[in-house]
Swiss-Prot record:
The record marks 370 as: Required for activity. This is ATP synthase subunit alpha. It catalyses: ATP + H2O + 4 H(+)(in) = ADP + phosphate + 5 H(+)(out). InterPro entries: ATP_synth_asu-like_sf (IPR023366), ATP_synth_asu_C (IPR000793), ATP_synth_asu_C_sf (IPR038376), ATP_synth_F1_a_nt-bd_dom (IPR033732), ATP_synth_F1_asu (IPR005294), ATPase_a/bsu_AS (IPR020003), ATPase_F1/V1/A1_a/bsu_N (IPR004100), ATPase_F1/V1/A1_a/bsu_N_sf (IPR036121). GO terms for molecular function: ADP binding; ATP binding; proton-transporting ATP synthase activity, rotational mechanism. It holds the Pfam family ATP-synt_ab_C. It is a peripheral membrane protein. One of its GO terms (cellular component) is proton-transporting ATP synthase complex. ATP binds at residues 169-176. Its main location: membrane. Keywords: ATP synthesis, ATP-binding, Cell inner membrane, Cell membrane, CF(1), Hydrogen ion transport, Ion transport, Membrane, Nucleotide-binding, Translocase, Transport. The gene is atpA. It comes from Rickettsia akari (strain Hartford).
Length: 512
């Protein structure tokens, strides 16, 4: 039987229509060279900057350089698994990480994979790591406080929700200790049912020792703070690419809380090592070096990260993301490249000094050059009532103390002012991992500023404070409750407090 051409065409059309096969176009390139965590790839003509590519071994890469005839990608994992000649395929995706409450209590790597041995994370939502910072209209001014539990900070350098406050100082001056204390201090708010009081915490370890990260996680677990904390770890032994993306990944996790009307606090520990990792990547990508061999866009590296911290407007849910970046200085040099960059991006800095630390003033906050540019608007009225004069009194004390070294003859008024200053410094000292509720801080500062400590020997100020707070917790709870609920010291509360303190000072001074 002879078929006509038109019949042949119809049969072929039917057969083709019955074939249920979708052809998938894959763009595949080839690795030209690989080394130091960088792969040079030929053949991916349409790949975009910031796109994820997949190597033959399953390891992922992030495209950072687009050149005339090739592209360069940083390998996010073990570069020994990538060899010259391997095929590389486009994923047509940008880098995403899991977000949500399922991550709370977990330790994850820079890509959001769990590394704590507690099984998979059941997260339903993913977010891009390089999200755009909120615009001006979407934001509102900082108005609610973040209580760190540290007297020297909550009274003199207050931090507000949505603020970016830099913690800067030499190594071993207690920068991480302030950050960890702030996380532990949020436990009190998490014991309440009101969601608007709670602050979820994210701690990002960049280029730290594994032992240090394990120690911090252990401390947070012991304090019961891991229940509301995510730890993102990109340790010194991991690829520079993972250290580079870790803060952005963690920031996306924090933005989930911010954009859903909740409050989050993110700690970047530390951005000096982050800049070093980015410098390493940039130099290996043959980008031109600038000052201190950092690339020209190192300012943008940190500004695009820190601008994502914000207090959102009412229309956007009233959420907030507060950032505490940490910078390590060399021999107290705050005028180096990275410290000055981050100081200019943030809304203030807490400067920790080695000299004060070795003198036993801990936390070693230099009150003179530490500043909070927006936090005072968030400070509660009760704290303003007692802390208003502290900064000035401490500045006058430092000046008088430096002059008193030159001569021994001091008039009684100057001597009294120096003695008062020494007691103020003493009352601002605080043990590590012992954050105080704000109402107890207010009472301690009230005692210091109203000169109740003048008759207490200097070496016994800490003992006096501990005994006084214990007595108030046991027998004068109404004073604490009044300050906590009213958020100010009412006349009635002040009268009660004065009567209690006068009796307590008399009783303490006659103690053996």
């Amino acid at each position: 039987m002879k078929l006509k051409p038109i019949e042949v065409a119809e049969i072929l059309q039917k057969e083709i229509a019955n074939i249920n096969c979708l052809s998938e176009i894959k763009e595949v390139g080839q690795v030209i060279s690989v080394g130091d965590g960088i792969a040079k790839i030929y053949g991916l003509a349409n790949v975009k900057s910031g796109e994820v590519v997949e190597f033959k071994s399953g390891v992922k890469g992030l495209v950072l350089n687009l050149e005339n005839d090739s592209v360069s990608a940083v390998i996010m994992g073990d570069d020994n698994q990538v060899q010259q000649g391997d095929n590389v395929k486009r994923t047509k995706e940008v880098l995403e990480v899991p977000v949500g409450k399922a991550l709370l209590g977990r330790v994850v790597d820079a890509l959001g994979n769990p590394i704590d041995g507690k099984g998979d994370i059941a997260s339903k939502e993913y977010r891009h790591i390089a999200m755009k910072a909120p615009g001006i209209i979407e934001r509102t001014s900082v108005s609610e406080p973040v209580q760190t539990g540290i007297k020297a900070i909550d009274s003199l350098i207050p931090i507000g929700r949505g603020q970016r406050e830099l913690i800067i100082g030499d190594r071993q001056t207690g920068k991480t200790a302030i950050a960890v204390d702030t996380i532990i201090n949020q436990k009190q708010a998490h014991s309440l049912t009101n969601e608007s009081d709670k602050i979820y915490c994210i701690y990002v370890a960049i280029g730290q020792k594994r032992s240090s990260v394990a120690q911090i996680v252990k401390k947070l677990e012991d304090a019961g703070a891991m229940d509301y904390t995510i730890v993102v770890s990109a340790t010194a032994s991991e690829a520079a690419s993972l250290q580079f993306i870790a803060p952005y990944s963690a920031c996306s996790m924090g933005e989930y809380f911010r954009d859903n009307g909740m409050h989050a606090l993110i700690i970047y520990d530390d951005l000096s090592k982050h800049a070093v990792a980015y410098r390493q990547i940039s130099l290996l990508l043959r980008r031109p070096p600038g000052r201190e061999a950092y690339p020209g866009d190192v300012f943008y590296l940190h500004s695009r990260l820190l601008e994502r911290a914000a207090k959102m407007s009412e229309e956007k849910g009233n959420g907030s993301l507060t950032a505490l970046p940490i910078i390590e200085t060399q021999a107290g040099d705050v005028s180096a490249y990275i410290p000055t960059n981050v100081i200019s991006i943030t809304d203030g800095q807490i400067f920790l000094e080695s000299e004060l630390f070795y003198k036993g003033v801990r936390p070693a906050v230099n009150v003179g050059i530490s500043v909070s540019r927006v936090g005072s608007a968030a400070q509660i009225k009760a704290m303003k009532q007692v802390a208003g004069s502290v900064k000035l009194e401490l500045a006058q004390f430092r000046e008088l103390e430096s002059f008193s070294q030159f001569g021994s003859d001091l008039d009684p008024a100057t001597k009294a002012q120096i003695d008062h200053g020494k007691r103020l410094v003493e009352i601002l000292k605080q043990a590590q991992y012992r954050p105080l509720p704000v109402e107890e801080q207010i009472i301690s500062l009230y005692v210091g500023t109203k000169k109740y400590l003048n008759d207490v020997p200097l070496q016994k100020v800490k003992e006096f404070e501990d005994k006084m707070l214990t007595e108030i917790r046991l027998n004068k709870k109404d004073i604490l409750e009044s300050i906590k609920n009213e958020q100010r010291i009412t006349e009635e509360t002040e009268q009660k407090l004065k009567a209690f303190l006068e009796n307590f000072v008399k009783a303490y001074c006659v103690m053996p």
